[in-house]
């Protein structure tokens, strides 16, 4: 295993970031997973994390992320 890689469970699927962003903060992981940080809500290990905390929230190997994309619409 590459020590620079990060293995995560994202929306129920195993994902590997190789190389992992440095530092491995939630905001950088979200961007590395190709999500728009302005359009998602994130649950990290069972806890919804406010967007203001993303720059300081550390993500570790084996963590669980549920990422929900906000979609506009309606009538």
Tell where the protein language model's regions lie, with residue ranges.
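Ubiquitin-like/PB1-type beta-grasp interaction modules and other compact soluble beta-rich domains
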Residues: 1-75
